[in-house]
A protein has these predicted regions:
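Helical "lid/switch" subdomain of P-loop NTPase nucleotide-binding domains
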Residues: 58-59
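STAS-like cytosolic regulatory interaction modules
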Residues: 1-53, 65-124
Length: 124
């Protein structure tokens, strides 16, 4: 299984699409990409995690660190997770919910919703 992070820009937002397993081995890759994006001057970041099918505590740690970094720049971080809810939604959503940190993040059902200003985040 290949872990991949691809990036692009849409207006003021940097978008990182993540796929594969987000774990102890792969989480440093995502951490570095987030740091690179912020170092390039992007303070609005969408992390598309809809293709991440496994996430362990180190992956959650990277998400929390990304939130802290973006907030320190007065930026905005939005996560994209499939909109099926915490109960039967993505593995990442279930892990965030189980660890009690889901409420820390603005979560959207797809990238277009995350990029829009009128869409409300999905409820935790």
């Amino acid at each position: 299984v290949t872990f991949k992070v691809t990036g692009g820009e849409q207006g003021e937002w940097a978008v990182l699409q993540v796929s594969g397993e987000l774990d102890l081995v792969t989480s440093p890759v995502l951490r570095q990409r987030v740091h690179d994006v912020v170092a390039e001057g992007h303070h609005c970041l969408v992390l598309d995690l809809s293709e991440v099918f496994f996430c362990d505590s180190s992956g959650v740690g990277v998400l929390i660190a990304a939130r802290r970094l973006i907030r320190s720049c007065q930026g905005r971080l939005r996560l994209v997770l499939p909109a099926r809810g915490a109960a039967d939604g993505s593995h990442v959503n279930r892990v965030l919910g189980a660890l009690g940190v889901r409420r820390l993040f603005d979560v959207y059902g797809d990238v277009n919703a995350a990029l829009g200003d009128e869409g409300e985040p999905l409820s935790a």
